[in-house]
Amino acid sequence: AKYVDDIAVPPNTLQILLGQSKFAHAKILSMDLSQVENFPGVIKVLTAADIPGTNDCSPFAGDDPIFAENIVSYFGQSVFAVIAEDIKIARNAIELADIKYEELPAVLTIDQALETGNVLGPPAVIECGKVDQALAKSKNKLEGKIILGGQEHFYLEGQAAYACAGEDTDIVVHCSTQHPTEIQHKVAMALGLSNHDVTVITRRMGGGFGGKESQGNLPAIVAALAAKLTGRPAKLIYDRDDDFILTGKRHDFQIFYKVGFEDNGLINSVIV
């Protein structure tokens, strides 16, 4: 079976590496990428200023920039991209980036979020019956807390995208994704194209488990942008370290519950 990184590519195919934030939360004060751009073998450096369309790779909320502009909101967030003749050149060049940050307070745990009131939005409540009354009348009651750690989608094939520019405004993207249509829409939005200009091909995936529903948007967009701006095929393959850092997770949970039940074990009320 052939996966994205196994596809035979032309010898002029470019390799891409993302420049990532060193802070969980910080203001970008200045960014000098001139030494990166002038490094031998580097073809182009991409930032938010190079995006002709919308600087967003989120599935729908519009809150996940392709490249951070003024604020970084998580460790490892993409700030720029290096397009080079090979991946070794990109790795060496990326170390020459001169970015100055002002570190800001970061919320890193559920407890910190609860203490500071830093939540993403109001809770969604699903209710059936008069649970408070049922709990009050229950003969037996229990309450407690369950803590679940986060999980990483450990697919064997990492996030991967390979893009080629076609005639006129056409762009073809090969990628490992559970959601080719979303990739099509996000690439079109970022490049300022119509959906019919973008063809997405997913022959197979080396695992996904939900981790390739939307997380493939970023590499697909950047590869497509690189191919469009340079006129050469371009590939962005996350190594395992970058995949762990850049992608979202099944996050931690803290579950608080109250349950009322009878002597025979019949549960008559649950609040979670």
How would you describe each model-predicted region?
Residues 111-191:
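Helix-loop-helix junctions that connect adjacent transmembrane helices in secondary transporters/permeases
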Residues 63-89, 210-263:
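Glycine-rich and small/hydrophobic secondary-structure elements
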Residues 1-123, 141-144, 229:
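Flexible, low-hydrophobicity surface segments
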Residues 14, 69, 157-162, 254:
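Short glycine-rich loop/turn motifs
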